[in-house]
Amino acid sequence: MRTSSLPETRRDSAPVRLMTYNIHRWAGRDQRLDLDRLASIIRDAGADVVGLNEVLHPVTMNGRTYAPLAELADRLDMRYAFGPSGWLDYGPGWHGPVGNALLSRFPLRDATNTLLPRLPSSKQRSLLGAAIAGGPARGLTAFVTHLDHAFEGTRLLQIQGVLKRMAQHGPHFLVGDFNTPGFMGRNTRLLLPPVLRLLAAAGYQDAFCAVGNGPGRTFPSHSPLVRIDFLFLPLRWARGLRSARALSGNVTYQASDHRPLVVEWAWPQGEALPA
């Protein structure tokens, strides 16, 4: 005899805080690797899931090899996943595999790293994804990427690869440094670059554009002029967006050349739990 049960639905789901943060190769604006500083920013923001860009893992400094990603996760009591894009020689005696990372208060599973399309003259970029397997974000897949810094045409090619990869998934969100200036006000809505127009056409909502507080500029951290760090959700799941803001403060100014973006989100009312 076969039995079945109705899908569980989410009612008054607890919110989760999602963060995207380019950590500038572990080097603050003062060129120091300061894990206490980074940990305090993430902890004070109450972040549950964090997408990191420009992560070296492991990193060799002055002949010694360190694993700051693992140590940062340990300090925050978080799990982590890393997806390399290539190799970086940041400076004399400072080098290692570089890419994106995820930190999560909840278990992560099925982490995958996808190398994105590129032009012959451009650096390799990647997309890291992992399923969140516990807590109020269970059933959500987190993706983090870092697009080319030089040319919108290259970024457009890369985001097409991102969209193709994410199309295989159910509920998910995408964060990262897109190196593409975002919507900053009513008069710029029609001037969105092709990358952001393509995401909108594919049915993705820019979280800050929907529920953002304050100016939202993320770069450069000491005197931000543009918003190039984003969180996107498919429109179906974007109904759960509650707030978005770029962090500020003296510690944030020194910790990286970017400001982190923090978004609060909950499962939309009545959505069924993924199997």
Regions found by a protein language model. Give the residues of each.
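Active site of divalent-metal-dependent phosphoester/diester hydrolases
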Residues: 61-65, 78-102, 121-123, 179-255
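Soluble or luminal CAZymes and related metallo-dependent hydrolases
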Residues: 30-37, 64, 68, 122-124, ...
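N-terminal, active-site-proximal structural segment of metallo-dependent hydrolase catalytic domains
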Residues: 1-78, 82, 87-94, 269-275
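Beta-strand-turn-beta hairpins that frame and shape the catalytic cleft
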Residues: 5-19, 96-100, 104-109, 122-144, ...
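A short C-terminal boundary segment appended to hydrolase-like catalytic domains
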Residues: 245, 249-275
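Active-site beta-strand/loop signature of hydrolases that rely on acidic residues for catalysis
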Residues: 17-23, 38-64, 103, 130, ...
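Alpha-helix termination/capping residues and helix-transition junctions
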Residues: 44-46, 105, 136-139, 168, ...
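Short loop/turn motifs that cap or connect beta-strands within the blades
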Residues: 114-117
